[in-house]
């Protein structure tokens, strides 16, 4: 009776759909000392459920063959299956899942005793971490189970993944809201108690707190409610206080018991707040220098005469010498030339403030004319519809 208390949905619907879309489906059930078997063809039973033997084990085997009448392609992508089965193994510590690809005689075994801790470790491999993984599991009084694992690394992106009853929510929901609220409150409380905010003269935001954070938030909810059939956002209101309360208590204790880790995390957050402020100032400066204002265009840009972006081309060339040759050989009517240094900043690995303060990147932003950042970026203002590197 307890098996489906925190299930992901109506399992019968899932197998019914698979059955209807398969030319053949075989069920083998080991239960109550007997082996039961049934076969279906395009969703219709070939024969009733039949006892075919005795057993001392339990479990169900489902085999299906996708219908070529329904699908134009029936090739399974093992990478997609492996990714999801690995995820399920992380979310259910100690559960061993074996994936065999009999087409090439390959076998993948997923077995993670550490659960979410190992999930965070897997995501953060190859990155420099700032703290040991923080991990807790709590069973709330209302039957909601909360499990969280997190770790900060030296990157600048937030990577928080949320799950309800093993189902991923790419749009988050009430569990994510509870987690974020508790995380920000716990860090602000720690930094205020240590007098870091006044000392460093910064105001930190939730975004600053989550820069470089990898976290997994997994909840087990008896009757979850989602915003849609695809379950991409959790809307159960009782989950937010459950996650927030559990996270508040456990995370505050972690910060007090691990002063060195807390200090490293706080240092990264303060750096993020400073960078955000510097980026805001740089954005304002870029906004004032409108790229559509000819006076604001980069000095090295040899612009074209054409004013219609759809007919204009921009050539990005390496260095002034190549720029000189390109300017001599271009069609002035529609071809613009912008010389740049050979090796500029790798913006994928750079923080926003460093990127925007780079002279070469700034020149590109101004020449292209569509701005930068979530609030400013507008591709409709692009000055050249063809850009040649």
Swiss-Prot record:
A biological process from GO: DNA topological change
Domain Toprim: 312-389
Gene3D superfamilies attached to this UniProt entry: 3.30.230.10, 3.40.50.670, Histidine kinase-like ATPase, C-terminal domain
Task performed by this protein: A type II topoisomerase that negatively supercoils closed circular double-stranded (ds) DNA in an ATP-dependent manner to modulate DNA topology and maintain chromosomes in an underwound state. Negative supercoiling favors strand separation, and DNA replication, transcription, recombination and repair, all of which involve strand separation. Also able to catalyze the interconversion of other topological isomers of dsDNA rings, including catenanes and knotted rings. Type II topoisomerases break and join 2 DNA strands simultaneously in an ATP-dependent manner.
PANTHER family: DNA GYRASE SUBUNIT B, MITOCHONDRIAL, DNA GYRASE/TOPOISOMERASE SUBUNIT B
Domain of life: Bacteria
Family recorded in the similarity comment: Belongs to the type II topoisomerase GyrB family.
Reaction(s) this enzyme catalyzes, per UniProt: ATP-dependent breakage, passage and rejoining of double-stranded DNA
Annotated compartments: Cytoplasm
Keyword NAD: no
Descriptive protein name: DNA gyrase subunit B
Site (Interaction with DNA): 343, 346
Subunit structure: Heterotetramer, composed of two GyrA and two GyrB chains. In the heterotetramer, GyrA contains the active site tyrosine that forms a transient covalent intermediate with DNA, while GyrB binds cofactors and catalyzes ATP hydrolysis.
């Amino acid at each position: 009776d307890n098996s489906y208390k925190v299930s992901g949905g109506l399992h019968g619907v899932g197998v019914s759909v698979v059955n209807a879309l398969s030319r053949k489906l075989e069920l083998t059930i080991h239960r109550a000392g007997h082996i039961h078997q049934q076969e279906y063809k395009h969703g219709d039973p070939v024969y009733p459920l039949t006892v075919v033997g005795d057993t001392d084990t339990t479990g169900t085997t489902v085999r299906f063959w996708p219908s070529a009448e329904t699908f134009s392609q029936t090739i399974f992508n093992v990478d997609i299956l492996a990714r999801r089965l690995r995820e399920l193994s992380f979310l259910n510590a100690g559960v061993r899942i074996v994936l065999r690809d009999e087409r090439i005689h390959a076998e993948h075994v997923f077995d993670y005793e550490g659960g979410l801790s190992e999930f965070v470790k897997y995501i953060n491999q190859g990155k420099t971490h700032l703290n040991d993984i923080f991990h807790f599991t709590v069973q709330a009084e209302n039957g909601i189970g909360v499990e969280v694992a997190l770790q900060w690394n030296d990157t600048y992106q937030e990577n928080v993944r949320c799950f309800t009853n093993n189902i991923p929510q790419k749009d988050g929901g009430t569990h994510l809201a509870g987690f974020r609220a508790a995380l920000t409150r716990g860090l602000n409380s720690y930094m205020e108690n240590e007098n870091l905010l006044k000392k460093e003269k910064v105001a930190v935001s939730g975004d600053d707190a989550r820069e470089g954070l990898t976290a997994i938030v997994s909840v087990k909810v008896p009757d979850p409610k989602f915003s849609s059939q695809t379950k991409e956002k959790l809307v159960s209101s009782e989950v937010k206080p459950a996650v927030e309360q559990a996270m508040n208590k456990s995370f505050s204790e972690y910060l007090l018991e691990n002063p060195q880790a807390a200090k490293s995390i706080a240092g990264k957050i303060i750096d993020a707040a400073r960078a955000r402020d510097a980026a805001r100032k740089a954005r304002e400066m870029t906004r004032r220098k409108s790229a559509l204002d000819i006076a604001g265009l980069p000095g090295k840009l040899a612009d074209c005469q054409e004013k219609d972006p759809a007919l204009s081309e921009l050539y990005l060339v390496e260095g002034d010498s190549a720029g000189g040759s390109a300017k001599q050989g271009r069609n002035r009517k529609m071809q613009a030339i912008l010389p740049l240094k050979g090796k500029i900043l790798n913006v994928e690995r750079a923080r926003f403030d460093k990127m925007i303060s780079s002279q070469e990147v700034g020149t590109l932003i101004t020449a292209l004319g569509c701005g930068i950042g979530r609030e400013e970026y507008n591709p409709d203002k692009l000055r050249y519809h063809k850009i040649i590197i």
